[in-house]
């Protein structure tokens, strides 16, 4: 069971979408709301447990190299996800059109956004010259960011937290699953 202050209905929906597409994820058994629960734990997801060990903890258990089958299986899953198209409008948001969760933005919640311009404006707005060695470096970075924001990108479904600790590999070297879909959604 997952029951944290970050657990959401959107995460359960993301997992169900991935499972329906053949991507190995824990199977959602049920999802529930707990509006009066302590510590802001308002949602829980009851799910199956996947076998394997995370890539982050695999150094002693697996020989990680390009010969392992998990790497090709990982590529297939990612390519498959990249083929999905957003339903209806090209909203940047969760699978159900609500806000996205990301540990990479202040407050950890953002959107949904009606277009890419709105999305990029939100991402760049907290930028501050204080984080750079000089004002010139800050200005140069803003110009570069603005150029990137002018490009039009396809809206694709993305896991949102694709790190080694969220990828499981079995003892046989095969991909056994992806965890933590709380940041998943439609992104440029």
Predicted regions and their residues:
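Short amphipathic alpha-helical surface micro-motifs
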Residues: 26-28, 64, 137-141, 159-161
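Acidic, glycine-rich loop-and-strand cores that form catalytic or ligand-binding grooves
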Residues: 90-147
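Short, solvent-exposed segments of well-ordered alpha helices
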Residues: 65-68, 149, 153
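ATP-binding pocket architecture of kinase catalytic cores
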Residues: 1-109, 113
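Intrinsically disordered, low-complexity regulatory regions enriched in Ser/Pro/Gly/Thr
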Residues: 22, 38-39, 149-151, 161, ...
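Active-site Asp-x-Gly
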Residues: 116-117, 152-157, 163, 168-188
